[in-house]
Amino acid sequence: MKKKYILAIDQGTTSSRAILFDQKGHIAGMAQREFTQIFPQPGWVEHNPRDIMTSVYTTITELLNNTQIDVRAIAGIGITNQRETTVIWDRQTGQPIYNAIVWQSRQTKDICDQLTTAGYQDLVHAKTGLLIDAYFSGTKVKWILDHVENAHTQATRGELAFGTIDTWIIWNLTGGQVHVTDYSNASRTLLYDIHALRWDPDLLTMLDIPAAILPDVRSSSDIYGLTQTPYFHGEQIPIAGIAGDQQAALFGQACFEPGMAKNTYGTGCFMLMHTGKKAVESKNGLLTTIAWGLNGEIEYALEGSIFVAGSVVQWLRDGLRMFGKASDSQAYADRVSDNGGVYVVPAFVGLGAPYWRSDVRGAVFGLTRSTTKEHFIRAALESMAYQTRDVLSAMQADAGMELKELRTDGAAITNDFMAQFQSDILAVPVLRSEIAETTALGAAYLAGLATGFWSSREEITQHWAINLCFKPQMDKQQREHLYAGWKQAVAATLGFRVA
């Protein structure tokens, strides 16, 4: 049967999606399922790994039922995932020994503080391109092994397996036959040397993590194994692409040349700039990461990770109950001509790049008796744009490249107010992709290249199209005045301590 589709599994922080793409990179069908968020203590965020797999299986079933396609028409499967989120499971039973610790979770902050005090920061940065922070997988692995009875002993014996979410999904889809990750996900663990391309023994010793639990690291576009699950009606479909969500979005946005950049506005906000085959060391609080491994070559990126972006809109909706639907935020923001002097610094779980302060918490500044709900909502939306400028300033300084345009995707940037304000604050055009699901599309492209569904990156580039281009309209004086207010608000937030 003619292969007509690539299936992308996009496993995110709050939901899982299954998306079918056709030869032109257009969506032929999609299903989505949310799953439960677990908050055992303030600052802790966990998921039940079984809930994640249930959501994946449910979306696959729903997608196939709704589209009524023949499973044999699927050429391959690409997987993209929330990065850093950590699962450890029993190899024999396939059962997790603890909940998945989510990338947002700060429960390993004490471990990070101990490592920093012990002077490991330079070693970690030199080998991984990362910083010592609770964000990354390594300290989460240590926490689980230290807190689950007999876990360390089992790990040493090789009875346990560690994986980021891509690894966990592939293990389950292949019936426990394949324990693998790709370069992009490995580079986010705090355990992988991004220059030597190996799990690093010094880093494993630093965190007392047995090497026996680690997955194999492979190219981001490769045939890793075949599905062994009834959800595909007994068909064995090649799993052929893996990339962490942000690297997948960079690929889906066709940012294949050095200096090209994208920003994804999801739960967090993540800006990546392609730096080619050179790992650019950041001196300005950014991360150096592997973009992907492809055709025997490694390509790198600079990344600025913002912990709270779209989730600030969820907070306005669910926590403060300021509106009923996230999409309502645009109408409220448009009702006022400015932010009324209000700045929201959404450091709910600390501040990411370029500050890297996990100890600070959110703050609001500039409130007066005349402040309205509209001002507050507008200020919260603006915080995403200000944080992006913080990252871009650091990125341009590190890479020595000036950004010509910013390619964007994610739910928050579908808000026209947000997209225009982002362009105004950056003073560069903001391009919104025609296909919003660029993260899933990137995973699909990687799988399609491995299976021959697409022939080359040049073919992929021809598929990329703009939905809208937002050009700067704000004058420089106003732009710098607004940004100066943001910097003041951040400085005050950094100086505040909870008693």
From Swiss-Prot:
EC number(s) on file: 2.7.1.30
Catalytic activity annotated for this protein? Answer: glycerol + ATP = sn-glycerol 3-phosphate + ADP + H(+)
- The entry's ATP-binding residues are 13-15, 267, 310, 314, 411
Which pathway does it take part in? Answer: Polyol metabolism; glycerol degradation via glycerol kinase pathway; sn-glycerol 3-phosphate from glycerol: step 1/1
Q: Does the keyword ATP-binding apply?
A: yes
Among the Pfam families in the record, one is FGGY_N
Query: Which residues make up the binding site for sn-glycerol 3-phosphate?
Result: 13, 83-84, 135, 245
Stretch forming the signal peptide = none
Activity control mechanisms: Inhibited by fructose 1,6-bisphosphate (FBP).
* Sequence positions that bind ADP: 13, 17, 267, 310, 411, 415
Task: Tell me which Gene3D superfamilies the record gives.
Answer: 3.30.420.40
Q: Which GO terms describe its biological process?
A: glycerol catabolic process; glycerol metabolic process; glycerol-3-phosphate metabolic process
Q: Work out whether the entry's keyword set contains Cytoplasm.
A: no
- Cross-referenced InterPro entries, in alphabetical order? ATPase_NBD, Carb_kinase_FGGY, Carb_kinase_FGGY_CS, FGGY_C, FGGY_N, Glycerol_kin
One annotated GO molecular function is: glycerol kinase activity
Q: Where does glycerol bind?
A: 83-84, 135, 245-246
UniProt keywords, alphabetically: ATP-binding, Glycerol metabolism, Kinase, Nucleotide-binding, Transferase
Cellular compartments per GO CC: cytosol
Top-level EC class, please? Answer: transferase
Q: Which family does it belong to?
A: Belongs to the FGGY kinase family.
The record's annotation in PANTHER family points to: GLYCEROL KINASE, SUGAR KINASE
| Functional summary from the UniProt entry | Key enzyme in the regulation of glycerol uptake and metabolism. Catalyzes the phosphorylation of glycerol to yield sn-glycerol 3-phosphate.
Q: What is this protein called?
A: Glycerol kinase
